């Protein structure tokens, strides 16, 4: 199995980097198993060659997984069952660890706080930073000893080492862009990289499926997960309905503003600024017989001071596009000075403010440094639709992740950023 994998990736060059080295024969190899085909294949790659391969399953949530259908089986129970089936097939031991409290405090509560303030946070980035590559590492350090194990996950990203210079380890995009998850890993601690193995990032999804079938894995045909499991299994998978159970209603007006007079017109009500995101289609009734109001309307701005949501007509309305953003508290994935030096050549830099987004070219950027923080004002080469405060913006130099941080301000006019 491992030889088959190495033969596949051996044909793929990534100069000036070399792939992460393999463990020694009797090293501890710990595979974070989620029950999906990707982590199952990751486990299979090592289980046959390294006798000290073990699995670990993280349970980070145990609230009712179907708030409108309490009789439905929680997703974590199904996942744990599938993990055990794979572990039995591979003849490896698997531990189950519970990080519900950590997830709630470090990921879920900050997410709720962000939504209540009208921003759009990304809990997956926080989960990777604080739980999967934070709390799990602490647990593994205590169990196996710091530096005495390798951590393997099924993420679509790559850990590569510089062939020259300092020999630093870096996080790179997956070779298979349709599944790339480097955006979600952009805030993990760089000290993790030297003992982190991401074998799936060197493969395409069809290759992963083929390897799963070759190994006879019970999860070979399991569909890919879509988003947050406890949201998909509740309230028909509608995130807005899910949030209603945790955020108080804070009704306000949905308005338009006349571009000439500045006069406001109210067209409906919202449950709270958290109930809509920038760029989202608004399903309210507009007078379609009037040419001025025909068409589809979208959220262009959340007005926190007045608790109003401003809408505009047309998916490509200019008001939905911005060319300037500010990132506060940028977190470098590597030495801080190394990241700062990379900003000297903005022509090589791109960014993503969504996962799987086509990389966005940067026109210029301005760094504001302090002892503790790195704030960046970025001017884009072209305007982008629905850049939203609270989103994480990840910066890249070629395919290498420099780091990321939350977007604090967005502006159409780059002179007022």
From Swiss-Prot:
> Which terms does the record give in the GO molecular function aspect?
ATP binding; sulfurtransferase activity; tRNA binding; tRNA-5-taurinomethyluridine 2-sulfurtransferase
- Look up keyword Transmembrane and say if it applies: no
- UniProt cross-references to Pfam families, sorted A to Z: tRNA_Me_trans (PF03054), tRNA_Me_trans_C (PF20258), tRNA_Me_trans_M (PF20259)
Q: Which SUPFAM superfamilies match?
A: Adenine nucleotide alpha hydrolases-like
Judged by the first EC level, this protein's enzyme class is transferase
Q: Does the keyword Nucleotide-binding apply?
A: yes
Q: Which GO terms describe its biological process?
A: mitochondrial tRNA wobble position uridine thiolation; tRNA modification; tRNA wobble position uridine thiolation
What is the residue range of the signal peptide feature? none
**Which pairs are disulfide-linked?**
127-229
Recorded hits in NCBIfam families, A to Z, give: PRK00143.1, trmU
| Family, similarity comment | Belongs to the MnmA/TRMU family.
**Additional observations:** Present with 1510 molecules/cell in log phase SD medium.
Would you tell me the protein name for this molecule? Mitochondrial tRNA-specific 2-thiouridylase 1
Q: Which organism is it from?
A: Saccharomyces cerevisiae (strain ATCC 204508 / S288c) (Baker's yeast)
